[in-house]
């Protein structure tokens, strides 16, 4: 019986409960979907999800961020004004910094998989308890790369 104990499934169940208790739909849905995949024949798709899930998530996030431009909610005039407003210039600089950190984070997570568990725990805790969003592992890994010099 103990040989069939699946710690990873227990972790996903705990995350599901944390998501429900904190009323965080992202964590609840993600954990629920992964549990269903894990306990069904769909688990054969885990290698594909692991290989492409991050890129797909970034693609969906980018589509969401660019939608106000495509829909016209953010006018061309507003976009042009962003290059002359101090606040917008600072926002552009911060956006550049965060994108750079995310790139460093992807490289670090690929080259040092031993840090991934800690980054994921911190991110999930931040999402579940602090109402954050799950883009944290990339930025956290980017910040970590600055501290450890990678």
UniProtKB/Swiss-Prot annotation:
Membrane topology: Multi-pass membrane protein
InterPro entries named in the record: UPF0756_TM (IPR007382)
Source organism superkingdom: Bacteria
Broad class of the protein's primary localization: membrane
Pfam family, any one: DUF441
GO cellular component entries: plasma membrane
Cellular compartment(s): Cell membrane
Coiled coil: none
UniProt keywords, alphabetically: Cell membrane, Membrane, Transmembrane, Transmembrane helix
Transmembrane residue ranges: 1-21, 45-65, 83-103, 115-135
HAMAP family linked: UPF0756
Homology family: Belongs to the UPF0756 family.
UniProt protein name: UPF0756 membrane protein ABSDF1616
Source organism (scientific name): Acinetobacter baumannii (strain SDF)
Lineage: Bacteria, Pseudomonadati, Pseudomonadota, Gammaproteobacteria, Moraxellales
């Amino acid at each position: 019986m103990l040989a069939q104990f699946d710690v990873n499934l227990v972790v996903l169940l705990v995350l599901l409960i944390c998501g429900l208790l904190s009323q965080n739909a992202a964590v609840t849905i993600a954990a629920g979907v992964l549990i269903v995949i894990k306990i069904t024949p769909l688990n054969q798709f885990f290698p594909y999800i692991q290989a492409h899930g991050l890129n797909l998530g970034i693609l969906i996030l980018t589509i969401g961020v660019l939608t106000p431009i495509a829909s016209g909610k953010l006018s061309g005039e507003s976009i042009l004004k962003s290059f002359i407003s101090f606040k917008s210039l600072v926002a552009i600089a911060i956006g550049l910094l965060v994108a750079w950190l995310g790139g460093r984070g992807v490289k670090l997570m690929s080259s040092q998989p031993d840090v991934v568990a800690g980054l994921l725990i911190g991110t999930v805790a931040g999402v579940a308890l602090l109402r954050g969003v799950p883009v944290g592992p990339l930025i956290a890994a980017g910040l970590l790369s600055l501290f450890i010099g990678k």
